[in-house]
């Protein structure tokens, strides 16, 4: 077959390229990483971590960030911090001066710190990120749980005792199996030796009888 026979026509190539570029998105979506639930002690300071992965360098002129708060999943969102060329703290009445930006957009970190956490701060915190030319806006959601006291540590003594008992039992079983195996092996070796000895004695007796008959 001639080489030109299987080459695509120019018109077909242009059509195929047009279709290809129409299907390929102009930007790639980012991934936002946040903890699903964050439990903190009442009156303490806590960091609400929010980081993202992007294939593009952060351009502060195009990059944008919104932090919002919700009392419940069906409640309306209240914006309390944003980034437009610079950090803008909206200082909502519920937070006052207790919110502080502790991230670095250039390092793909847009975390915030909430100081002197109160019971009323419990709820949902949303982190919205836009980093053109990424087409899709990134979103992270954190549920903040405020505790009145530190939960008691789990007593691991029982688990340790059970683990030690099971481990000891298994060790004994393994030891017994090894002893039984050794005893069986010794018996088998002894039987093999006895059989071989009997066979040799039989051969010796046979040779002796043959010599007597010849005489």
Curated annotation (Swiss-Prot):
Residues 30-157 are extracellular. The keyword Magnesium does not apply. Residues 180-215 are cytoplasmic. It is found in: Cell membrane; Cell projection, Axon. InterPro entries: Ig-like_dom, Ig-like_dom_sf, Ig-like_fold, Ig_sub, Ig_V-set, Myelin_P0-rel. It is a single-pass type I membrane protein. The chain crosses the membrane at residues 158-179. Keywords: Cell membrane, Cell projection, Disulfide bond, Glycoprotein, Immunoglobulin domain, Ion transport, Membrane, Phosphoprotein, Signal, Sodium, Sodium transport, Transmembrane, Transmembrane helix, Transport. One of its GO terms (biological process) is sodium ion transport. The modification Phosphothreonine is found at residue 204. The modification Phosphoserine is found at residue 192. Residues 187-215 are annotated as: Disordered. GO terms for cellular component: axon initial segment; node of Ranvier; plasma membrane; T-tubule; voltage-gated sodium channel complex. Belongs to the sodium channel auxiliary subunit SCN2B (TC 8.A.17) family. Regulatory subunit of multiple voltage-gated sodium (Nav) channels directly mediating the depolarization of excitable membranes. Navs, also called VGSCs (voltage-gated sodium channels) or VDSCs (voltage-dependent sodium channels), operate by switching between closed and open conformations depending on the voltage difference across the membrane. In the open conformation they allow Na(+) ions to selectively pass through the pore, along their electrochemical gradient. A voltage-gated sodium (Nav) channel consists of an ion-conducting pore-forming alpha subunit functional on its own that is regulated by one or more beta subunits. The beta subunit SCN2B is disulfide-linked to the pore-forming alpha subunit. Interacts with SCN1A; regulatory subunit of SCN1A/Nav1.1. Interacts with SCN2A; regulatory subunit of SCN2A/Nav1.2. Interacts with SCN3A; regulatory subunit of SCN3A/Nav1.3. Interacts with SCN5A; regulatory subunit of SCN5A/Nav1.5. Interacts with SCN8A; regulatory subunit of SCN8A/Nav1.6. Interacts with SCN9A; regulatory subunit of SCN9A/Nav1.7. This is Sodium channel regulatory subunit beta-2. It comes from Rattus norvegicus (Rat). The lineage of its organism: Eukaryota, Metazoa, Chordata, Craniata, Vertebrata.
């Amino acid at each position: 077959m001639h080489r030109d026979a299987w080459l695509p026509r120019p018109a077909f190539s242009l059509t195929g390229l047009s279709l290809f570029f129409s299907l390929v998105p102009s930007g790639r979506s980012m991934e936002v990483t946040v903890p699903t639930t964050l439990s903190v002690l009442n009156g303490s300071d806590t960091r609400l971590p929010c980081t993202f992965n992007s294939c593009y360098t952060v351009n502060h002129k195009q990059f944008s960030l919104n932090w919002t708060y919700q009392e419940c999943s069906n409640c309306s969102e209240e914006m309390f911090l944003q980034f437009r060329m610079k950090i803008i703290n909206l200082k909502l009445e519920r937070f006052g001066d207790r919110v502080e930006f502790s991230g670095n957009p250039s390092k793909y970190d847009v975390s915030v710190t909430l100081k002197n956490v109160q019971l009323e701060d419990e709820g949902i915190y949303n982190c919205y990120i836009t980093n053109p030319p990424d087409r899709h806006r990134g979103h992270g959601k954190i549920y903040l749980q405020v505790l009145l006291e530190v939960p008691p540590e789990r007593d691991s003594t029982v688990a340790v005792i059970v683990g030690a008992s099971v481990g000891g039992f298994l060790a004994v079983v393994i030891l017994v199996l090894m002893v039984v195996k050794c005893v069986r092996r010794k018996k088998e070796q002894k039987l093999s030796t006895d059989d071989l000895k009997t066979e040799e004695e039989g051969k010796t007796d046979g040779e002796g009888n043959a010599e007597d008959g010849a005489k």
